């Protein structure tokens, strides 16, 4: 997917707020959905500043969709005022949970973190470090471990990771245009094979 580069560039030098945020969503069908709901239920155990969202503010419960017509509450990377409401808080940390856990499967749930210079506290692709700098990512396995991790966070943790946050931000911007990458891949394939 393509991302909103202009919006992402607004985060290049933004001041950060010591906070962790999280978006649960409404779906509860597969492993990642179930984990998000269990995490949401743990909110009362979080001792640092935080903001838990059950769903995006622009999600229409009557029509079960967003204004952009997407029937999923998460939609495309950083699109819609609901998502911007989440990222404009400038939180240092965000709990990012993929729908499922597979080696090379990662989505806007972590890419949005990189594009906004937010440290992802992440459950998802085990080999995300093959694509992004793992030192700018905090991993967790279940909701109980997540609560422990969050409650030990300090603002200094963010600043200690700053170099890796910047690397992941640059990589996300470089990889932002999905269709351009496909075009470059096809061009390279044609050239290599003399087609």
Task: Describe each PLM feature range.
Residues 143-159:
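C-terminal "capping" alpha-helix adjacent to the active site of nucleotide-linked donor transferases
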Residues 1-139, 157, 169-193:
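Nucleotide-sugar donor-binding catalytic core of glycosyltransferases
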Residues 161-168:
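C-terminal anion-handling pockets and recognition modules
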């Amino acid at each position: 997917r393509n991302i909103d580069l202009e919006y992402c560039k607004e985060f290049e030098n933004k001041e950060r707020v010591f906070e962790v945020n999280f978006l649960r969503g409404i779906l509860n069908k597969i492993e990642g959905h179930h984990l998000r709901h269990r995490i949401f239920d743990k909110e009362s155990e979080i001792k640092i500043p935080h903001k838990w969202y059950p769903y995006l503010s622009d999600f229409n419960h009557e029509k079960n969709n967003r204004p952009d017509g997407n029937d999923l509450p998460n939609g495309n990377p950083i699109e819609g005022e609901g998502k911007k409401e989440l990222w404009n808080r400038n939180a240092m940390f965000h709990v990012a949970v993929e729908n499922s856990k597979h080696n090379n499967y990662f989505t806007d749930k972590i890419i949005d973190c990189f594009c906004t210079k937010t440290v992802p506290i992440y459950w998802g692709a085990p080999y995300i470090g093959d694509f992004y700098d793992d030192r700018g990512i905090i991993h967790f396995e279940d909701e109980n471990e997540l609560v422990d991790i969050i409650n030990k966070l300090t603002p200094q943790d963010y600043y200690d990771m700053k170099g890796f946050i910047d690397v992941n931000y640059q990589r996300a911007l470089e990889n932002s245009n999905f269709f351009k990458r496909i075009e470059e891949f096809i061009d390279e394939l044609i050239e290599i094979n003399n087609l």
